[in-house]
């Protein structure tokens, strides 16, 4: 890590790495595991009553616009954040007015809508390695979200908080985080008093499920840790965060294109800096804040996840990236080049092996990239269906068979449909005109044009009786 730092007192930074020398036993993450195995949404947004089994590692939510992808993610976030009922330093997401399902009805030819209650979010899952069920509900427009059916989860979280607050505690705190579509641009204004109020492991939960992002806490942590490393020497969990960023950047830009990737915070820039040698042997250095949207979107998210793990569980040292938890990401492909979309899920699960990911996407590259993903297909009527793995399938096949989108522009699809219709009617002269139009647009050797030409020639052949 860079020695390019200014001096200041180290007290705050020291307190953030208490417990550094603790040696955790192997397999700690199994005892600390957190995940949702089954999510049920009743009258939640456009879901009347949907039961959604989830994979412990990777869940990909797909569907057309308006089918409920973001709604499902909000339901999952409502469920996962229930853990914060037992944590004094974070608040769970409540069931809100906009979460209530509406149904339309007609009275004397006038269409109206009514709200449908109760709204319920319920789960079966694992918390701190123990099987657990919990539920939250909203019974009416003037009611508050109930928590009675989540008492077991609240008790587990409260006990974890008490144990984690003890000196030299080995208790592992799970990470819960949400990254919405505004994660790059919708910056939340951080409060000045927040740093004074939170000086503990639980700072890792600050704004972790906020719909608007803030990098203030992230930059403060990097600044403090860089200063501490320059004074005290290497800190294992800080090195782990650094490695996470270096690996992701190298994967994004392609290992063959770069060498000697180094990521560090530099006080001179007041930013995280990426330094590497490119394929031409030239040295490059870029502040992360000045990089393209694609790089910043991924690196900011990875940095935020990794540093929160380091704050929550400094006692894990070099194994801090094995922190368990649940991370929810809306439109995982946001700002990413198609080549990066193919790698992002595998990168995330490799760097953070004990996290359960629930992500939404429109991208066929993302859908086909992960071997054992749980694919959840949503339709406009509020249904959620598990479908077979699309791993390794042709992108055009996914567009047609899963996303129900043609792999050509609509105008071209219509021309091919017209050609087939004319061929069926044996109107070969007009079919030939359409074919010639397609040849001009797509080229004589286009595979689909070639097939159409063969079909026309076969239909026009005179067969012996």
Predicted segment positions?
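Walker B catalytic acidic pair
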Residues: 330-331
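Loop/turn-to-beta-strand initiation segments
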Residues: 323-325, 354-357
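Extended helical coiled-coil dimerization/tether regions that scaffold
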Residues: 17, 23, 27-33, 203-322
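Conserved D-loop-proximal element of ABC-family nucleotide-binding domains
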Residues: 337-338, 342, 369
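P-loop NTPase switch/coupling surface
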Residues: 13-217, 233-237, 423, 443-465
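RecA-like P-loop NTPase motor core
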Residues: 346, 350, 365-465
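Conserved H-loop
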Residues: 361-362
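Short, small-residue-biased leader/transition segments that mark boundaries at the very start
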Residues: 1-7
């Amino acid at each position: 890590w860079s020695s390019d730092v200014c001096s200041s007192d180290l007290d705050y930074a020291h307190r953030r790495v208490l417990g550094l020398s603790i040696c955790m036993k192997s397999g700690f993450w199994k005892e600390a595991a957190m995940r949702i195995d089954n999510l049920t949404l009743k009258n939640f947004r456009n879901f009347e009553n949907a039961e959604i089994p989830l994979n412990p590692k990777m869940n990909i939510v797909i569907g057309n616009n308006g089918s409920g992808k973001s709604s499902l993610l909000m339901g999952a976030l409502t469920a996962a954040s229930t853990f914060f009922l037992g944590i004094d330093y974070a608040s769970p997401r409540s069931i809100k007015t906009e979460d209530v399902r509406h149904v339309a009805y007609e009275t004397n030819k006038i269409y109206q809508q009514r709200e449908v209650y109760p709204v319920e979010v319920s789960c079966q899952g694992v918390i701190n390695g123990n099987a657990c069920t919990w539920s939250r509900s909203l019974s009416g427009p003037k009611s508050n979200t109930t928590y009675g059916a989540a008492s077991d989860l609240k008790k587990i979280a409260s006990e974890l908080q008490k144990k984690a607050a003890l000196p030299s505690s080995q208790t592992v705190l799970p990470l819960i985080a949400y990254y919405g579509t505004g994660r790059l641009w919708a910056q939340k204004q951080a409060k000045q008093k927040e740093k004074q109020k939170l000086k503990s492991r639980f700072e890792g939960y600050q704004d972790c499920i906020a719909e608007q992002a803030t990098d203030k806490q992230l930059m403060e942590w990097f600044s403090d840790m860089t200063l501490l490393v320059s004074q005290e020497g290497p800190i294992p969990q800080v090195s782990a965060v650094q490695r996470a960023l270096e690996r992701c950047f190298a994967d994004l830009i392609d290992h063959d294109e770069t060498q000697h990737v180094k990521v560090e915070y530099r006080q001179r820039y007041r930013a995280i800096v990426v330094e590497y040698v490119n394929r031409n042997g030239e040295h490059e250095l870029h502040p992360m804040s000045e990089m393209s949207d694609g790089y910043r979107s991924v690196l900011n998210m990875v940095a935020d996840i990794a540093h929160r793990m380091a704050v929550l569980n400094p006692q894990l040292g070099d194994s801090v990236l094995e922190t368990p938890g649940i991370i929810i990401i809306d439109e995982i492909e946001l700002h990413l080049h198609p080549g990066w979309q193919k790698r992002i899920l595998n990168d995330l699960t490799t760097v953070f092996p004990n996290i359960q990911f629930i992500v939404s996407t429109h991208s066929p590259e993302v859908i086909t990239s992960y071997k054992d993903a749980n694919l959840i297909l949503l339709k406009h009527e509020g249904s959620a269906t598990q479908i077979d793995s699309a791993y390794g399938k042709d992108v055009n096949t996914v567009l047609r068979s899963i996303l129900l989108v043609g792999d050509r522009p609509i105008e071209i699809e219509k021309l091919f449909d017209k050609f087939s219709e004319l061929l069926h009617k044996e109107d070969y002269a007009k079919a030939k005109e359409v074919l010639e139009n397609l040849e001009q647009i797509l080229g004589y050797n286009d595979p689909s044009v070639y097939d159409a030409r063969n079909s026309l020639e076969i239909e026009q052949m005179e067969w012996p009786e």
